[in-house]
């Protein structure tokens, strides 16, 4: 959660990125900070962006982040797509919250995107895409729908009011994540103020089904992410203070998406003074069900400006017991990889 901003001239003066297209183009092709012929480098694209959610849609990698800026400047969401983890295309302003009357026109945080098949065909036009977002520093969590049937939108608010309104079990209505289980059920995880909540989504993906459940694990602060692997549910979340190097990621496990969860969290992501600090608010993707990648934000070493957060990708590994191993954060990033 929290702020982000992107100043093209400033970022280009301090980061070794190339922008082949002009800034006025509706989509901007970006190169990651490539450190070799095969590795992307971290951060993966320019600009102050945090809370990155990774998705795999239509043989492309997608990242939906928060724009890291003052609350008053956070009035939109950008998205980024890549065929290979090396070259990224920026899709500006996929949702403008100033067009949403209930939004308060500030503090647009932590988007999460899911999709629903319209028919049995697998063409991209056969999907409806839904974007869950929080605005107004806890005003509520809304849901928007792609008007084009594509993951880049643009998206428009579909309810005219929040899907989740106000505080639930002490949880601020921020940092939504849609988790689409392999049994066809959809779950919405969310929560700030050190409380975590989950609720099932209706089949239409724009309504709630059933009751809210509080699932707060020890140390939870914000930024939930649910991952399922080999029948085990890994509930990942941010711990510590997002403004300093106590920020990190821990996880607990369960046999169901609503718990009960293991009682002792394990911390697997932590910044350091050699690579980057304030590492947190993660997501995870796997291209093949075997190799796993963690996407997260961090700050440059010795940069304490609260909104100077950048998006990074590193590998994530499991041991034979199914435990997530501590992540080695890097400057070189991950190797390029296409999706079949």
From Swiss-Prot:
Active site location: 51 (proton acceptor), 222 (proton donor)
Biotechnology note: Beta-D-galactofuranosidases are being responsible for the degradation of beta-galactofuranoside (Galf)-containing glycans which are important as drug targets and immunogenic motifs in the production of pharmaceuticals due to the absence of the Galf monosaccharide in mammalian tissues.
Q: How does activity depend on temperature?
A: Optimum temperature is 25 degrees Celsius.
MF-aspect GO terms = endo-1,4-beta-xylanase activity
The pathway it acts in is: Glycan degradation
Glycosylated positions are 96, 165, 302, 328
Q: Which family does it belong to?
A: Belongs to the glycosyl hydrolase 43 family.
* Name recorded for this polypeptide: Beta-D-galactofuranosidase xynD
Task: Say which species the protein is native to.
Answer: Aspergillus niger (strain ATCC MYA-4892 / CBS 513.88 / FGSC A1513)
Taxonomic lineage: Eukaryota, Fungi, Dikarya, Ascomycota, Pezizomycotina
């Amino acid at each position: 959660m929290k702020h982000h901003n992107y100043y093209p001239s400033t970022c280009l003066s301090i980061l070794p990125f190339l922008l082949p297209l002009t800034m006025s183009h509706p989509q901007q092709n970006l190169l990651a900070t490539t450190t070799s012929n095969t590795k992307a480098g971290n951060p993966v694209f320019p600009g102050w962006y945090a809370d990155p959610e990774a998705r795999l849609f239509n043989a492309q990698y997608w990242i939906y982040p928060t724009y890291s800026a003052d609350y008053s400047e956070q009035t939109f969401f950008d998205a980024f797509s890549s065929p290979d983890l090396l070259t990224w295309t920026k899709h500006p302003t996929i949702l403008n919250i100033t067009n949403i009357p209930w939004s308060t026109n500030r503090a647009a945080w932590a988007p999460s995107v899911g999709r629903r098949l319209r028919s049995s065909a697998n063409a991209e036009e056969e999907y409806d895409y839904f974007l869950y977002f929080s605005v107004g520093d806890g005003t509520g969590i809304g849901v928007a729908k792609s008007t084009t049937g594509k993951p880049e939108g643009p998206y428009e608010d579909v309810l005219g009011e929040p899907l989740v309104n106000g505080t639930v079990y002490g949880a601020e209505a921020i940092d939504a994540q849609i988790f689409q289980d392999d049994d066809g059920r959809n779950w919405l995880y969310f929560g700030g103020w050190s409380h975590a909540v989950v609720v099932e989504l209706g089949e239409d993906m724009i309504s709630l089904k059933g009751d809210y459940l509080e699932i707060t694990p020890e140390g939870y602060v914000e930024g939930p992410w649910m991952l399922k692997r080999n029948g085990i549910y890994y509930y990942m979340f941010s711990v510590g203070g997002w403004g300093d190097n106590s920020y990190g990621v821990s996880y607990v496990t369960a046999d169901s998406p609503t718990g009960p969860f293991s009682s002792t969290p394990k911390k697997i992501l932590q910044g350091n003074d050699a690579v980057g600090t304030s590492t947190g608010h993660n997501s995870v993707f796997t291209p093949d069900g075997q190799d796993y990648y963690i996407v997260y934000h961090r700050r440059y070493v010795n940069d304490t400006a609260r909104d100077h957060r950048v998006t990074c990708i590193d590998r994530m590994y499991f041991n034979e017991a199914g435990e997530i191993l501590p992540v080695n954060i890097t400057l070189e990033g991950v190797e390029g990889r296409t999706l079949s």
